[in-house]
């Protein structure tokens, strides 16, 4: 698993992620969020 320290140290695999406070903005859509950016990796672990 690849953990991105820029995203509160949370593990991401497919870039599926949703957090307005993330440095990259709303990275992905896992529960209805708008994907503004794709986080590195391939899916939330």
Swiss-Prot record:
Highest taxon, organism lineage: Eukaryota
4-hydroxyproline PTM positions: 23, 40
Protein name, UniProt field: Mu-conotoxin-like Cal 12.1.1c
Purpose: Mu-conotoxins block voltage-gated sodium channels. This toxin reversibly blocks voltage-gated sodium channel in cephalopods, with no alteration in the voltage dependence of sodium conductance or on the kinetics of inactivation.
The UniProt record lists the keyword rRNA processing: no
Tissue expression per record: Expressed by the venom duct.
Organism from which the protein derives: Californiconus californicus
Disulfide cysteine pairs (residue numbers): 3-16, 11-28, 18-33, 27-39
Keyword Secreted: yes
Subcellular location: Secreted
Lineage: Eukaryota, Metazoa, Spiralia, Lophotrochozoa, Mollusca
Key words, A-Z: Bromination, Disulfide bond, Gamma-carboxyglutamic acid, Hydroxylation, Ion channel impairing toxin, Neurotoxin, Secreted, Toxin
């Amino acid at each position: 698993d690849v953990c991105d320290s820029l995203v509160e140290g949370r593990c991401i695999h497919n870039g599926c992620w949703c957090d307005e406070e993330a440095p990259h903005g709303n990275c992905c859509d896992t529960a209805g969020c708008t994907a503004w950016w794709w986080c590195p990796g391939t899916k939330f672990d």
